[in-house]
């Protein structure tokens, strides 16, 4: 039985919607990759390795971070939008050096705060900073 014009029109519309969805998904992936590259350039670190460190160091035990399932803690502040904040811990200007320092040795910056010092190299702290910046 031949297809009616209505069926052909519906078929073409469905194909157009699928093509649009694929294009939108591709643009989102490209935007995420661009954000990660920009974050790595700013922080001088490797965001992919920073994501591994985020899990290994147990950051999600105290903090939440959208898109990271193991980040469900309620002790520390949410880490969404760290790259958009003006200050770190309400005391330090938000720049890669200060964020990396805060990650490594928060007790030196604000003695007695709830965040423990995290033994790691300066490069590892830059990698973790790049990961946080890459999340927005």
Which residues does each predicted region cover?
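Short, Lys/Arg-rich N-terminal segment immediately upstream of the first membrane anchor
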Residues: 1-6
């Amino acid at each position: 039985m031949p297809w009616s014009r209505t069926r052909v029109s519906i078929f073409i519309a469905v194909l157009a919607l699928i093509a649009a969805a694929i294009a939108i998904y591709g643009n989102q992936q490209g935007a995420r990759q661009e954000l990660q590259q920009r974050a790595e350039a700013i922080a001088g670190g490797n965001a992919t390795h920073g994501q591994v460190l985020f899990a290994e160091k147990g950051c999600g035990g105290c903090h939440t971070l959208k898109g990271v399932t193991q980040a469900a803690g309620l002790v520390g502040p949410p880490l969404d939008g760290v790259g958009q904040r003006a200050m770190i811990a309400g005391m330090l200007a938000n720049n890669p050096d200060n964020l990396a320092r805060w990650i490594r040795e928060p007790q030196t910056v604000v003695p007695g705060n709830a965040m423990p010092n995290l033994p790691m190299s300066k490069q590892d702290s830059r990698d973790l900073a790049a990961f946080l910046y890459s999340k927005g």
